[in-house]
């Protein structure tokens, strides 16, 4: 397996036209090593301009080719590498590895693409609306909902739920502690004793009234 990493300079590459790509496509070529040597390694980025919305045109990286000895050695199909046509695309890491979010997928053809592992660090590219040979405002890949972003969001929500549950339990335990202190206090016992005494007096008073009522209802019998 060939492992290849490159720190791409933030420069707008020269544009070459190819009739096979169509009117809305361009390819940018980056050569490593001696530019005049046909055996030197070259990377070709094929970009396509399209209208995602009626009021805004976008460009996307459609294909990445690794060329050596004037022949294509590997082909990768990018996913999620796009930006408005008036912007450049920028990402900290773009590659074929899972740690790079697998933005470069090896081609399905049997050309040995799966044997290559490619990673671009500090990657930035723009193929349209170039002014003065400089990048325009960049759209970062971090703004999209990447798997790492979604995992971080899910972990944050789980942590928030755990903290909310812990706070609820803390408040409940504090309430139980206050109730226990209230029950165990001498004032509470004196109140209970006074209430029990009052209930006993009320019970005795009601029993005496019932006895008097029964005596008053006795009937006298006279025999002649």
From Swiss-Prot:
It is a single-pass membrane protein. InterPro entries: Ac45_acc_su (IPR008388), VAS1/VOA1_TM (IPR046756), VAS1_LD (IPR046755). Keywords: Membrane, Transmembrane, Transmembrane helix. The keyword Transmembrane applies. It comes from the Eukaryota. The chain crosses the membrane at residues 147-167. The keyword Transmembrane applies. One of its GO terms (cellular component) is membrane. It is found in: Membrane. Belongs to the vacuolar ATPase subunit S1 family. This is V-type proton ATPase subunit S1-like protein. The gene is ATP6AP1L.
């Amino acid at each position: 397996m060939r492992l290849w990493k490159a720190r791409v300079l933030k420069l707008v590459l020269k544009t070459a036209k190819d009739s096979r790509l169509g009117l809305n496509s361009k390819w940018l070529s980056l050569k490593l090593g001696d530019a005049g040597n046909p055996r030197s390694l070259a990377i070709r980025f094929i970009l396509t301009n399209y209208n995602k919305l009626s009021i805004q045109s976008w460009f996307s990286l459609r294909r990445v080719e690794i060329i050596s000895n004037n022949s294509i050695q590997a082909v990768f199909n990018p996913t999620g590498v796009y930006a408005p046509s008036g912007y450049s695309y920028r990402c900290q890491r773009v590659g074929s590895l899972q740690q790079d979010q697998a933005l470069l997928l090896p081609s399905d053809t049997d050309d040995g693409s799966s044997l290559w592992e490619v990673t671009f660090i500090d990657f930035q590219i723009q193929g349209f609306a170039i002014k003065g040979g400089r990048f325009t405002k960049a759209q970062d890949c971090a703004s999209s909902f990447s798997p790492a972003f979604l995992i971080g969001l899910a972990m944050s929500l789980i942590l928030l739920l755990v903290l909310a549950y812990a706070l609820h339990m803390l408040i409940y335990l504090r309430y139980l502690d206050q109730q226990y202190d209230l029950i165990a206090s001498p004032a509470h016992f004196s109140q209970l004793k006074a209430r029990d005494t009052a209930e006993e007096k009320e019970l005795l008073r009601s029993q005496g009234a019932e006895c008097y009522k029964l005596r008053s209802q006795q009937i006298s019998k006279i025999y002649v």
